[in-house]
């Protein structure tokens, strides 16, 4: 990817060229820490070794028995589902199989999906490192029962991605299900380029080897300077802006295929960096749609955010027909991609004119290699930010607290966090 930082120098808040050059000394130290973590395959840092350690042949072999499915169900939550959804939404087409993500426990949504797909032609990928995730296991039980009631042998339609032990691993062994391992030391939000994200991508027909090639190319280009490494440029600059008051980061791709990428980024950024009353709140937006709504706030609201605009340099062609309608002749003969790029440039200029810090990110195209590199580089950017901020990037204690409280509310008396629910103050208005 290419990162353009030029507009942050005169922004409010902003970063000077000298400031970035001074920060680059700390980036070099962060790079050394990251490289040491990679060499030792330390927890968290192990995610950056996935281009070398993931076995795409094993993944292809595991999914080979599922011939021509009509639908795929991803049953997971958070990083156990969002990475796969990002890959499918960016690179998948509208042909079968259709992919459905069951990453919530809304009964209306789950019921609607199960009633709309042919379960006998559906592949179920259940993803949970621990094998005990309440939402994932609940949805799995619901899908399994639906298949059984429909006369479908669910064991013929299920592939499991899980840890080396736990309920799901035991189930896979007892039912002889195909099962792939979640790599050790790789947090869920960093697992898109592992079995966690690649199983469904392979089922969908995406060239997962090309994704890994792109990520490997990005890994090979890491160096100890933000002026030579786009990932460090992004991570260091967003960190510097956050320390100066830009506590919100708006991720705004100008490509609908990257809309779920913005959602993936939001989890990565929030869960990794939101520690010790610090962090940068990620917001998902989509160009050009949200420039007709959210842009009002971004341009004219408080100067407490950085806007990340991202686009591919190459797009498919779709010509706008000529028209004799009054005032629209300028559109005729142009291209939808050209219009979207004009919207991108106009939005960037609008923000710069209002002194809003804006970072431009460009990739060659939305293809497997470019996407693999993009995902890898944003993971590196996040880790770089965490190193500079001295936060434990790879933990998620607040998330774990909520999980324990939910289990306590459902009757598991081992989790006392549920008591806080009853103790909270209320003021009801009806």
Swiss-Prot record:
Coiled coil: none annotated. It catalyses: alpha-D-glucose 6-phosphate = beta-D-fructose 6-phosphate. GO terms for cellular component: cytosol. One of its GO terms (molecular function) is carbohydrate derivative binding. Its EC number is 5.3.1.9. It is found in: Cytoplasm. Gene3D superfamilies: Glucose-6-phosphate isomerase like protein, domain 1 (3.40.50.10490). It holds the Pfam family PGI. It comes from the Archaea. It comes from Haloquadratum walsbyi (strain DSM 16790 / HBSQ001). This is Probable glucose-6-phosphate isomerase. Signal peptide: none annotated. InterPro entries: G6P_Isomerase, Phosphoglucose_isomerase_CS, SIS_dom, SIS_dom_sf, SIS_PGI_1, SIS_PGI_2. Its main location: cytoplasm. The gene is pgi. One of its GO terms (biological process) is glucose 6-phosphate metabolic process. Belongs to the GPI family. Keywords: Cytoplasm, Gluconeogenesis, Glycolysis, Isomerase. The active site is at 271 (proton donor), 292, 303, 403.
């Amino acid at each position: 990817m290419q990162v353009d930082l030029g507009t942050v120098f005169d922004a409010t808040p902003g970063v000077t060229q000298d400031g970035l050059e001074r920060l680059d000394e700390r980036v070099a130290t962060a790079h050394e820490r990251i490289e040491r973590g990679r060499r030792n395959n330390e927890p968290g840092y192990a995610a950056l070794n996935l281009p070398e350690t993931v076995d795409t042949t094993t993944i292809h072999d595991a999914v080979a028995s599922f011939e021509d499915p009509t639908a795929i169900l991803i049953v997971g939550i958070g990083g156990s589902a969002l990475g796969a959804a990002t890959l499918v939404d960016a690179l998948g087409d509208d042909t079968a199989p259709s992919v459905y993500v069951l990453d919530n426990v809304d009964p209306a949504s789950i019921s609607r999906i199960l009633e709309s797909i042919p379960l006998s032609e559906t592949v179920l990928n259940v993803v949970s490192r621990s094998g005990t995730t309440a939402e994932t296991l609940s949805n799995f039980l619901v899908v399994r029962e639906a298949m059984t009631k429909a006369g479908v042998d669910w064991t013929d339609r299920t592939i499991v991605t899980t840890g080396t032990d736990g309920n799901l691993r035991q189930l896979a062994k007892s039912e002889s299900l195909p099962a792939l391992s979640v790599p050790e030391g790789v947090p869920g939000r960093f697992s898109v380029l592992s079995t966690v994200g690649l199983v469904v991508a392979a089922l969908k027909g995406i060239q997962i080897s090309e994704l890994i090639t792109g990520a490997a190319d990005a890994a090979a280009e890491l160096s100890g300077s933000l002026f030579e490494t786009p990932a460090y440029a992004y991570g260091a600059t967003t960190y510097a802006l956050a320390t100066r008051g830009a506590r919100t980061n708006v991720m705004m791709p100008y490509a609908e295929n990257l809309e779920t990428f913005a959602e993936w980024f939001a989890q990565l950024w929030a869960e990794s960096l939101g520690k010790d009353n610090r962090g940068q709140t990620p917001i998902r937006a989509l160009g050009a749609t949200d420039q007709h709504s959210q842009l009002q706030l971004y341009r004219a609201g408080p100067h407490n955010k950085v806007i990340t605009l991202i686009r591919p340099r190459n797009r498919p062609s779709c010509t706008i027909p000529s028209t004799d309608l009054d005032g629209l002749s300028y559109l005729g003969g142009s291209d939808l991609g050209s219009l979207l790029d004009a919207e991108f440039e106009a939005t960037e200029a609008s923000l710069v004119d209002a002194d809003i810090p804006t970072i431009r990110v460009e990739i060659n195209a939305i293809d497997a290699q470019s996407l693999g590199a993009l995902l890898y580089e944003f993971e590196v950017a996040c880790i770089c930010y965490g190193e500079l901020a001295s936060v434990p990037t790879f933990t998620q204690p607040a998330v774990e607290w909520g999980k324990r409280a939910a289990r306590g509310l459902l009757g598991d008396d081992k989790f006392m966090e549920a008591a806080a629910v009853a103790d909270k103050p209320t003021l009801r208005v009806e």
